[in-house]
Amino acid sequence: MDTRTPEVPCGDLLQNAAENLLLEVEEHFQALTTTLNLRMEEMGSRIEDLQRNVDDLMTQAGIENSIKEPAT
């Protein structure tokens, strides 16, 4: 008795197509992750700049900063 699984017509082609699709999705996901990380870093820098500008304006206006930032 033959215990091998029956050959599926075009099975190898389908498997290759699925593997290629998964690799392509993985590449796109990695590119998106990289882009999002860069944009988050840029946003963090902009927020820090904004906080410094607000602090400077408050100092110029003679207003004490009542909200203290945690030390980093």
Curated annotation (Swiss-Prot):
<feature type="coiled-coil region">
    <location>
        <begin position="12"/>
        <end position="62"/>
    </location>
</feature>
<protein>
    <recommendedName>
        <fullName>Heat shock factor-binding protein 1-like protein 1</fullName>
    </recommendedName>
</protein>
<dbReference type="GO" id="GO:0003714">
    <property type="term" value="F:transcription corepressor activity"/>
</dbReference>
<comment type="similarity">
    <text>Belongs to the HSBP1 family.</text>
</comment>
<dbReference type="Pfam" id="PF06825">
    <property type="entry name" value="HSBP1"/>
</dbReference>
<dbReference type="InterPro" id="IPR009643">
    <property type="entry name" value="HS1-bd"/>
</dbReference>
<keyword id="KW-0175">Coiled coil</keyword>
